[in-house]
């Protein structure tokens, strides 16, 4: 696969996964009976852990190639999605906390590594193409939100929906 296509695919998958999760937050809130404050507290942990994931990915990229890290971290996002669905189905708060931590760490580390790869592609091509990668992310976020909305309308469980997303997005 050509480097630009591969990095575009990484941005696309990340946008789709993120929007799929965010669009289904009301179902998670309903399943657990979270108040607005409780939900805000749970969700605040995701970007905090994502920041940790970004820093760790940056540190590890010195030792391993960012493409290798990107593949591994994308698996964390997929696992986080599936575990989020399973936690919601089982109404297990400890499992949900673990799932959101996996998602946060995975999202942050994927963000860092896919941007590292994007910079590499720019150097390879000799011109700026980062905006096109972010456009793929945005398109995927729209499609992910639409897919999540359609899944909610058909009563597909979170576990079922997130499992499909995980299988499709992680090659």
Describe each model-derived feature in a short phrase.
Residues 53-66, 152:
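Helix-to-loop junctions at the C-terminal end of transmembrane segments
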Residues 67-74:
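Primarily marks hydrophobic transmembrane alpha-helices of the MFS/SLC 12-helix fold
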Residues 108-123:
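Intracellular juxtamembrane helix-capping segments at the cytosolic ends
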